[in-house]
Amino acid sequence: MDSLTHTIQTLMPKLIEWRRDFHHYAESGWVEFRTAAKVEETLDKLGFELAMGRDVIDADSRMGLPDDATLATEFARARQQGAPQKWVTAFEGGFTGIVATLNTGRPGPTIAFRVDMDALDLSEALHDGHRPHRDGFASCNPGMMHACGHDGHTT
């Protein structure tokens, strides 16, 4: 147990940094372009096999998809806000899904985790009683904020 505790303590600063980054750059459903690209980049570095975008999402099954103009505007914003260029194009048009497989080479059951990345269409509180505002990681995207923990799920 001591090694697990040590591992968690070692990872904690990076996990906090990632969560605050996702919180700061909140993106609504189907426009999580920056978030998905950051996640994809990290999973690739960790050695996961990756499938994404149109390879994992059926276009006709998406509900609540923004109009084409909104998708284009949000895609441009994600690129401006630092979405890794190598990955972001796979998600263009509202195909912000990722399937990551870690092949351990060991026999046994397959375990799946489902993680939501989208923010809510709400405005973040802008007063010092709200920790993200006070500590400088409140959403910089007006009308989008993580209010239900998906920034934590994604981390």
Where are these regions (language model features)?
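Active-site alpha-helical elements of protease catalytic centers
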Residues: 146-155
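Acidic/His- and Gly-rich active-site-bordering loop/insert found
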Residues: 2-146
